[in-house]
Regions:
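Conserved SAM-binding loop of SAM-dependent methyltransferases across substrates and taxa
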Residues: 84-95
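Class I SAM-dependent methyltransferase SAM/SAH-binding core
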Residues: 94-122, 126-130
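A short acidic, Gly/Pro-enriched loop at the edge of an enzyme's catalytic core
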Residues: 133-142
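Conserved class I S-adenosyl-L-methionine
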Residues: 179-201
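Short alpha-helix
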Residues: 213-231, 235-237
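Rossmann-like AdoMet/SAM-dependent catalytic core
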Residues: 222, 236, 240-311
């Protein structure tokens, strides 16, 4: 069953009739905001409300993680974990076709209203495992923006990350790519006094998620080993700064930051933090020691499709 919200198609064929996760009343508030305001008004709303969730879901700066990437109108994109549509809009502007998937009908409705002019956007509501099993279309890109770390929650397998990657791999065209954005559990901000983004506890990732189940981020070396061990040998790392959520600069191995560039570090909009040391000076030390890539707060990883006989 399909619904139309503006020019967007809301596909409910795989929706089970209830949302299994929610941020509560703030989602209802977000729905009202996007129903009654245009994107040009969002920045004024953010400044007026001073609310983390409103900023997180409506800020145009969220799009920076993919605004620069060379997706074209010849390309099709599968967006997994689309949420309230912070990234769906920029994908729809760049690509020829976007299929966005999310488990929540409420969040998908917010997405549809937020991007209601995007006639090339189809939002499929439902568990990705079910959607994946019924999806025959293949895509040039599959995006995992803040999604891969939750694989253990939704895939009940002994090797959930491998299963998730291989499930995604089947939906890529030849020469297709996975585009992943994820926090670095050894990001400098976590040493400097920021709480772990997903669980809100100090040093939780640094200490190996000893009090956490269901979500896990990785260091650069851990992510490289995970990809290599599962046959994904062709990948490239980028380094969003200050992080992937509100990136202002995207660095790469061929263009790394210079001393003095990384000074925009008080970005804890969602929670209080400690200031244990001067992050700018610490970044300078990492840069001089050629260790920035390992202490970047986030990663953006471009992963080439794995050939079926490549393990």
């Amino acid at each position: 069953m399909n619904e139309k919200i503006g020019k967007v198609t809301l596909n409910l064929d795989y929706y089970e009739g209830q949302d299994f996760y929610s941020d509560g009343v703030i989602e209802e508030h977000l729905l009202e905001l996007v129903k009654h305001h245009e994107p040009e008004e969002y920045q004024d709303i953010i400044l007026k409300e001073k609310n983390w969730a409103v900023m997180y879901h409506l800020s145009q700066q969220r799009e920076n993680i993919l605004e620069w990437y060379p997706i074209t109108k010849e390309d099709s994109v599968l967006e997994i974990g689309a949420g309230c549509g912070a990234i769906s809009g920029v994908l729809a502007k760049k690509a020829g076709r976007v299929v966005a998937n999310d488990l929540s009908k409420m969040r998908s409705s917010i997405n549809a209203w937020k991007n209601k002019e995007a006639e090339n956007l189809e939002i499929v509501v439902g568990n990705f495992n079910t959607v994946s099993d019924n999806l025959t279309e293949t895509f040039d890109y599959v995006t995992l923006i803040g999604v891969f770390e939750y694989a253990k929650t939704y895939i009940q397998e002994e090797e959930p990350y491998r299963v998730f990657l291989d499930k995604i791999n089947r939906h890529l065209k030849p020469n297709g790519k996975i585009l992943m954005a994820i926090e670095n559990k050894l990001g400098l901000k976590y040493f400097a006094g920021c709480k772990e983004d997903h669980v809100g506890r100090m040093f939780e990732g640094i200490e190996g998620y000893k009090n956490t189940s269901g979500v896990e981020t990785f260091s650069k070396r851990e992510l490289e080993k995970l990809l290599d061990a599962n046959g994904y040998h062709n990948y490239r790392f980028y380094y969003p700064y200050p992080d992937y959520k509100f990136a202002t600069t995207i660095y790469s191995d061929s263009y790394l930051p210079k001393k003095g560039e990384l000074r925009n570090n008080r970005r804890n909009f969602d929670a209080e933090r400690l200031l244990l040391f001067d992050e700018g000076l610490a970044f300078d030390t990492m840069i001089s020691a050629e260790l920035f890539q390992h202490f970047s707060n986030s990663f953006f990883v471009e992963i080439q499709k794995k050939e079926e006989n490549n393990a």
